[in-house]
Amino acid sequence: MVIATKFGIVRQAGTYERRIDNSPAYIRAACEASLQRLGVEQIDLYYCHRRDAAVPIEEVVGAMAELVRAGKVKAIGLSEVSADTLRRAHAVHPIAALQSEYSLFTREPETDVLPACRELGTAFVAYSPLGRAMLTGALDTAKLEAGDFRANNPRFQGEAAAANAALVEQLGALAREWGLTPAQLALAWMLARQPHAIPIPGTRRIARLEENLAAARWR
């Protein structure tokens, strides 16, 4: 088991307003707080969740590297950064993983981030590999609740939602030809196209977890 956690997004108590903090002092404090909450002596993978443009990436990674040298963190990662930022960060300390959204719907990382990861030996961790559930074929965008963040995402609204649903129907038809679910085909596509990518689909049910894991047999 690998324990990964993040720092960078700070929620204001009471109001839940968010701000981004990449200051070295906050990085150290957040690490100590995570160690205490998790009840461990070392974090396997420590991510910078979001970049604070006011703090140079070299300073951010330098602070993270100090935690590695102190034995509090085993490896460090970044989330949602450009290929250039990844290279600058890697020049300070090896970056074990870069997390970014990637799926059949979201292909931007193929342009330069994925090649940079291959070049540097950095694992690419793909979040929302099922397009925030759209690629499962089971999501009804008309029934999204008001508190669901997807309700405010253009991808799930109006004509875009209808167009995406039509694409998912085609995905489902192709999946059935192979005896797969739409989710399994979407994951198998990623594993075949990007062998070094690690998809992290979220789920609340064991049955869905088992369904997703079975996709690895079809890469």
Cite the ranges covered by each PLM segment.
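N-terminal small/glycine-rich loop or linker at the start of catalytic domains
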Residues: A4-R18, Q42, Y47
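Short acidic capping loops at alpha-helix termini that bridge into adjacent secondary structure
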Residues: M1, T5, E41-L45, K74-A75, ...
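Short, glycine- and charge-enriched coil/turn segments that flank and shape catalytic ligand pockets
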Residues: Q12-R19, T141-G147
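Short, acidic/polar
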Residues: N22-L38, S82-R88
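Beta/alpha (TIM)-barrel catalytic core signal, keyed to glycine-rich beta->alpha loops juxtaposed to Asp/Glu
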Residues: R51-R219
